[in-house]
Amino acid sequence: MHLVFLLMKFQMKLNESIRYASILVIDESGNPLGVFTSEQGRQLAAKKGLDLLLINPNADPPVCKIVNYGKYKFELEKKAKAKRKNQSQLKEIQMSYNMEEHDYQVRLSQACKFLKAGDKVKVTLMLKGREMQHLELAQNKMAQFQADVSSLAQLAKPPSQEGRNLSAIFVPKKS
């Protein structure tokens, strides 16, 4: 949301801040009205009770549109919010290969919740101290986890060792 405000603050010129000798004016429905001076463009917008917004300052002549600025700003925010909403996030779940069954079930239910919400899940099995000697037990735990979430997810990145951790990434299955 802050990005939209920054863009509007620094790039969008409105009404009196538009100072060009001539501008191409477009009405609220997108039809070009013609080339006018900045003052004439502001007067056209004022007659309709709307604002004159600079759309493209790099064009020759610069392009301005007659809009209801409050509504226009709201639409931009709505589009930005919808774009953010559709992005999936990477959630991480950390486990140990020798954890108790209840703890494992809690992590499994968290992963299922994330996957149902459409997020990617990174499962990390942490190995401490001498546990590095029992890497096959950690791989077995990861295989068990993969089997348990196979109805909801598919493996995006197979289990790989990263230092003292064994991690894999799961993505939700397409319905």
Curated annotation (Swiss-Prot):
Location relative to the cell: Plastid, Chloroplast
GO terms of biological process kind: ribosome disassembly
Keyword Lipid metabolism attributed: no
Top-level taxon in the UniProt lineage: Eukaryota
Record's keyword terms, sorted: Chloroplast, Initiation factor, Plastid, Protein biosynthesis
InterPro entries attached to this UniProt entry: T_IF-3_C_sf (IPR036788), T_IF-3_N_sf (IPR036787), Translation_initiation_fac3_CS (IPR019813), Translation_initiation_fac_3 (IPR001288), Translation_initiation_fac_3_C (IPR019815), Translation_initiation_fac_3_N (IPR019814)
GO molecular function, one term: ribosome binding
Pfam families, A to Z: IF3_C, IF3_N
Gene Ontology CC annotation, any one: cytosol
Keyword Manganese set for record: no
NCBIfam families: infC
Quaternary structure note: Monomer.
Family note: Belongs to the IF-3 family.
Role description: IF-3 binds to the 30S ribosomal subunit and shifts the equilibrium between 70S ribosomes and their 50S and 30S subunits in favor of the free subunits, thus enhancing the availability of 30S subunits on which protein synthesis initiation begins.
This protein's name: Translation initiation factor IF-3, chloroplastic
Source organism of the structure: Cyanidioschyzon merolae (strain NIES-3377 / 10D) (Unicellular red alga)
Taxonomic classification: Eukaryota, Rhodophyta, Bangiophyceae, Cyanidiales, Cyanidiaceae
Gene (UniProt): infC
